[in-house]
């Protein structure tokens, strides 16, 4: 069977809900069917106004309660913003992206 890498990337703007739990379970089941597969967890905390530490903790404890484990230290998306900006600027400089001039 081919090695599979899945990821679950919830946003900590609320508690873990049934839809997110379902997605996490599907990814975990896919990972569990093949010993070489991985499940990575990334916390999408880029909505600074609504993201809260208590919601992140609720998501993590909910996943543990469901018996879902992951294969990495959870990545915190906002910790990577400088790398994202670096890559975006490189794409702009190389002519592979453009800045949106829309008002909204």
Language-model segments: residues:
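N-terminal Rossmann-like or analogous alpha/beta NTP/dinucleotide-binding catalytic cores
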Residues: 1-104
């Amino acid at each position: 069977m081919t090695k599979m890498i899945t990821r679950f990337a919830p946003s900590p703007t609320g508690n873990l809900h049934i839809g997110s739990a379902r997605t996490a379970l599907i990814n975990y089941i896919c990972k569990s069917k093949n010993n070489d597969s991985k499940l990575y967890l990334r916390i999408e905390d880029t909505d600074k106004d609504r993201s809260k530490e208590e919601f992140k903790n609720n998501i993590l404890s909910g996943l543990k309660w469901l018996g879902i484990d992951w294969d990495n230290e959870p990545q915190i998306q906002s910790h990577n913003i400088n790398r994202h900006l670096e890559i975006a600027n490189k794409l702009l400089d190389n002519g592979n992206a453009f800045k949106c001039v829309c008002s909204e």
